[in-house]
Amino acid sequence: MSLIIKSILNADAEARYFRPGELAQIKGFNASAASRLRLVQALTENRERIVKQSANQLFQKRPDIVSPGGNAYGQDMTATCLRDMDYYLRLITYSIVAGDSTPIQEIGVIGVREMYRSLGTPIEAVAESIRAMKYVATSMMSVEDRAEVDTYFDYLIGAMQ
């Protein structure tokens, strides 16, 4: 849940106006909006590169995934793997915009481990694909930008384990 929504809900639950500290937090959140949107734009514009390079890293590290019997064996299954990676990158962009991990949690994580287990997909391979995307994505960023983006990649990786 974004800082703004949390502040509204907290104030409303107590039937009060915003406190000065809450207003200062909202001001800071709004001041960082341009930076967050710039990061999301960069990730969005480079999504194909991020996903393809990350998939190549994953498949080199885990050749069992693309070998006969692997979950990404064959053109259709590889495309499904790339689609899932793109989906998780998109969730990360939602969270960056929100300034909060709630979109990852509410849209993408609930029940995902069980789903992958039921499909016979090794969840550690999914986590590894997200680690690879983190590496590729952050290699294109400044140290300051990495700190912002790392938070969401790390949250998603942790949720997959």
UniProtKB/Swiss-Prot annotation:
User: Keyword set for this entry?
Assistant: Antenna complex, Bile pigment, Chromophore, Electron transport, Membrane, Methylation, Photosynthesis, Phycobilisome, Thylakoid, Transport
The protein's PTM annotation reads: Contains one covalently linked phycocyanobilin chromophore. The chromophore is added by phycocyanobilin lyase CpcS 1.
Per UniProt, what is the membrane topology? Peripheral membrane protein
Instruction: List the subcellular locations.
Output: Cellular thylakoid membrane
What superkingdom heads the lineage? Bacteria
Q: Which residues carry this modification: N4-methylasparagine?
A: N71
UniProt main location, coarse? membrane
Gene Ontology cellular-component terms listed: phycobilisome; plasma membrane-derived thylakoid membrane
Q: Which residues does the annotation say bind (2R,3E)-phycocyanobilin? A: C81
Q: Name one GO biological process term.
A: photosynthesis
Pfam families named in the record? Phycobilisome
Q: Please explain the role this protein plays, according to its UniProt record.
A: Light-harvesting photosynthetic bile pigment-protein from the phycobiliprotein complex. Allophycocyanin has a maximum absorption at approximately 650 to 653 nanometers.
What is the similarity comment for this entry?
A: Belongs to the phycobiliprotein family.
Task: Summarize subunit and interaction data from the UniProt record for this chain.
Answer: Heterohexamer of two alpha chains, one alpha-B chain and three beta chains.
Name under which the protein is recorded: Putative allophycocyanin subunit alpha 2
Q: Which organism is it from?
A: Nostoc sp. (strain PCC 7120 / SAG 25.82 / UTEX 2576)
Q: Quick one: which gene encodes this?
A: apcA2
